[in-house]
Amino acid sequence: VSANDIKNVQDTWGKLYDQWDAVHASKFYNKLFKDSEDISEAFVKAGTGSGIAMKRQALVFGAILQEFVANLNDPTALTLKIKGLCATHKTRGITNMELFAFALADLVAYMGTTISFTAAQKASWTAVNDVILHQMSSYFATVA
């Protein structure tokens, strides 16, 4: 991932994350659940598909993504954060990479409708998401 991609992702995420807890967490998760029945069902099955439990998961998602974004300049730390996320999801039996890819793409779509978002910034998010998803896929392949 280039330095420019890192800057673009950090700048755009910062705009969204500033209001994540108060505004965007619930709005994004509502969009995500509406856009993907499979994701919605996975959360319902885990008991976190609505109400306070869903809000808590949305806040956790934001906090995890914040850690990923903050560590884009440190590949070792980023890898450890990604492995931690994967380990947690593995214990829950959630390893379907299509769901993770959809969630990250849906986040980019959400950002495109809520903050000023250029084509270059969108491309940077795609590059960063590809790195995250590749590492996740590699992790799940080694622990399957």
Swiss-Prot record:
It comes from the Eukaryota. CDD domains: Mb-like. Coiled coil: none annotated. It comes from Phreagena soyoae (Deep-sea cold-seep clam). Belongs to the globin family. Keywords: Heme, Iron, Metal-binding, Oxygen transport, Transport. InterPro entries: Globin, Globin-like_sf, Globin/Proto, Mb-like_M. The lineage of its organism: Eukaryota, Metazoa, Spiralia, Lophotrochozoa, Mollusca. Pfam families: Globin. This is Globin-1. PROSITE patterns: GLOBIN. One of its GO terms (molecular function) is metal ion binding. Residues 1-141 form the Globin domain. Heme b binds at residue 89. Homodimer.
